[in-house]
Amino acid sequence: MIQSEFSNIQIISHTIRKDPAMTAKILQLVNSSFFGLRQRVTNVGDAVKLLGRALIHSIALSANLFRQLEHQHPQLNRLWEHSYEVACLARQIVLMQQQSKDMADAAFTAGLLHDTGKLVLSTRLPEKYTQILETTEANNQSEWQAEKQMLGFNHADIGGHLLKLWGLPDHVVAAVVFHHEPTMSMENEFSLLTAVHVANYLVDKLHHPTHVNRLDRGYIEQLALTDALSTWESYSKKPTAA
């Protein structure tokens, strides 16, 4: 069993080393303040062991997708950083709720991929996506609402559909589909969706205090998480939060 695990790590590490950009991205993440490591990690094999296969898989999947598509539209140039910050905070929120590491890792995955639909829109419907962004700015409207108004669906719908095609777990897909409208999910307890919805709001609030995604406070109150929200927000403001 141990030998098998060691072999898997070697295979994953060898695959990553073939891609210099992927190697750089993974080492950047493992050395970020979020993981709080005392010594700098410079070896991909050590990074794989520290992060675990689940997180490495999520990072590799999203980094590859972002690298292919993020420069298709100038508005998306910071999307990787936003997604990473949401992923880190969503993971920490799950841990602060005393949930399992597996659930925390799933929250990281959902956070990292929650805006995947924006990449699809920008490449498949570039002119329409530009109009959506212009409408958002002109009307001080949320991007997902403008998408819904002009297309009949939004980036969360597209992202969820794509993740389902990729075979990601249903709870990860749901967290992506409903991350702007958690009440629509009919969930009645803390979940990945809760973590991603709140993390997305708090990260936006930190970087864009005058134009943030709306927090569904009714949803938070329904789950009796108002006090927890204050704790999560305090944590998000710490330098090590992302």
Report each predicted region and the residues it spans.
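Conserved alpha-helical "signature site"
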Residues: M1-T116, V120-Q131, T136-E137, E143-N213
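Terminal helices and disordered tails flanking the catalytic cores of nucleotide-processing hydrolases
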Residues: Y219-A242
